[in-house]
């Protein structure tokens, strides 16, 4: 991958080229419609309106019977890899001969004489003395009409990043029209086909200026590709494939993994790479690095330095050998002060010797954790104290905090209201054992101190459930066959107090039956004696592990990263770059495909970080497929529908939501953000679609939504809950869901990872020992009775697992310096339309107001789930942030 470091000046002086040209599309301007008005009425073929700087998209003049030519200067702002300074070679020769960038200007209008596209204006752009610029001067007939597109052919032997192209008529800067490019342009030696860039004026398909209709369709065909051959680095082809590249059976037969995206293992689709299949398994694709993603989906230089599979992998590969002599790969920490030492004393890092060049690599990748010992030249791997531990080092041990985090922690999207009792499994009892839960009426009512019956508590909406029983139970025996790990199915019931806080009543752990053993299940409560109290703490550790694993595999990876990739692919394949919906969604897709490719390369792959350190081991991603098949629905990805579906909210007669838990920080702040996004989407759709008929008649939009359903989420294509994209209301809901998932939902489940899981006893990723009372073996019970704290520590992740996860979460929780936050930057196409610009400014203003509202909520002592002694305030849905690990900020996209 080539990363940008310094902008390079590439420029030249080109001779005038006498050809037809004129200009349509400009920054902060409104187009005349390129031969039509915005309503679709044709303009006179003999008159080209002279637009103002505020409203015009094109530069134009009144044409009389005598044809005249205008001089148009094209200024290209470019940025190319810094390696060009070292080895320019053939490109220097090309520059000397004037062949650098070939520009072609495409008229929005057809030639009235022939009814065909006007002849294009061509000219070479050459280096100038100004850094990073090319310039061309072209002679353009006044009758050329508005420019609807610029074609660019890169004559260099290397790709080039072009930021924008500015067209100036007659040397008058006030006529400047900017084509926003922000794209890599391949060398013609890689692909002779020039790139096409359209005006910032957005057009529905039916409103496309006739001169660029064919080009609009051709561009989409190019982006779709032909579905054959292996993709190359410079290409921009978007296509679908199954998750068949997680395994590596040619390297190790134990690394064979099932294909996800089949009838047996349903899954969203990923971007096709076309790599050959492995020798051992014809269904598995060979692995390679880097993994192909379309060129413009790749990281910027700044982002690439912040996170990539290479940096992550090299950082961990440097850490592990460096600390291996000091840590035990299979043992846990012997006492809690040893865990605390990770944040105070740290682990010595050798500069040479056992760790090789470990210090330099680690310092480059995760500099936050490398610190110098005072008055020495030695360095240590010392983790930052997570905010939760900084505020209250014992909070993780308390039941109140355990419950509070289900509403305001890392995974606040899984708790449900208990609406049916008794609790019964939906799994086959012939396979897994009796379906009835061990959480009986007697146990729950006892833990409620007889205040009310279970039925009364359910009626008053006081009972809530965290249910990881049916999703994990089928994997219990398989996971237990893996070394040094165990698994149960679990259920936890909570009671809503009069103060609006939750308290856990009971936990159920279940082991399914097997050919040699009956089902085992038991309900645990915090009890009134030491033994029951410690068993309760062990049971909580198992539940926290289940919640942590489900969070990472489903709430985070599946519901954001994996499910969004099909939207990105379909958007690029079916919506033109000049389609208003494309331009609305594009900022929400930044970096996601590259992040997902890197995750397949280093995080979720066979023997990757997730498999090595999380509860389900090699079954982890397969388990996310089970969750996708059983529970994922597009319609309930809408925050209000999700809350209603989980019984956490009801819709009143006035349409507003009423929460079952008044102080539910994720829901409170989330609805604030959701409402802002929906209003922005509604204002945007209202501008471009005047009626439901406009939506239903949009052929690109229809093809886009059809492809999302039938190709991107093909394993769910026949589900009845898919909305139909045929009305403005439905379109607004669809767009709001996509924008919410990529922004608010992802921010809520990602950027608090180090704050809450950086201290791993609070969010263990794996439990390595069965709870002692399962087998009731004398030796285990004797050890438990003598040293219960030691049993807990031996159950938690090993020293090496903990270090690996902590280092990974430090990287994954961080905002890049080039992060783009929602509501912060307007796209050039939005600025080109005054009404859209005004709508965006209102959207941005609402998000700024949300910052203050969230601060007030966090400072209100009545909100006990987000304000109190030692409590981490809920800031994950505050829209803006500084770079680094901050625990706040909503980027536009899934960028990490």
UniProtKB/Swiss-Prot annotation:
Binding site for Fe cation: 556, 561, 746, 750, 896
Biological process annotations from GO: fatty acid biosynthetic process; green leaf volatile biosynthetic process; lipid oxidation; oxylipin biosynthetic process; response to jasmonic acid; response to salicylic acid
Domain Lipoxygenase: 202-896
Domain PLAT: 80-199
Entry GO terms, CC: chloroplast
Main location: plastid
Enzyme class: oxidoreductase
Pathway(s) it belongs to: Lipid metabolism; oxylipin biosynthesis
InterPro entries the UniProt entry points to: LipOase (IPR000907), LipOase_C (IPR013819), LipOase_C_sf (IPR036226), LipOase_CS (IPR020834), LipOase_Fe_BS (IPR020833), LipOase_plant (IPR001246), Lipoxy_PLAT/LH2 (IPR042057), Lipoxygenase_dom_3 (IPR027433)
Biased composition (Basic and acidic residues): 249-267
EC number: 1.13.11.12
Cofactor annotation comment: Binds 1 Fe cation per subunit. Iron is tightly bound.
GO MF, any single term: metal ion binding
Family annotation (PROSITE patterns): LIPOXYGENASE_1, LIPOXYGENASE_2, LIPOXYGENASE_3, PLAT
Stretches for region Disordered: 249-289
Catalytic activity from the UniProt record: (9Z,12Z)-octadecadienoate + O2 = (13S)-hydroperoxy-(9Z,11E)-octadecadienoate; (9Z,12Z,15Z)-octadecatrienoate + O2 = (13S)-hydroperoxy-(9Z,11E,15Z)-octadecatrienoate
Names of the cofactor(s): Fe cation
Keyword vocabulary terms for this entry: Chloroplast, Dioxygenase, Fatty acid biosynthesis, Fatty acid metabolism, Iron, Lipid biosynthesis, Lipid metabolism, Metal-binding, Oxidoreductase, Oxylipin biosynthesis, Plastid, Transit peptide
Localization annotation: Plastid, Chloroplast
General function of this protein: Plant lipoxygenase may be involved in a number of diverse aspects of plant physiology including growth and development, pest resistance, and senescence or responses to wounding. This enzyme exhibits linoleate 13-lipoxygenase activity.
UniProt family annotation: Belongs to the lipoxygenase family.
Record protein name field: Lipoxygenase 2.3, chloroplastic
Native organism: Hordeum vulgare
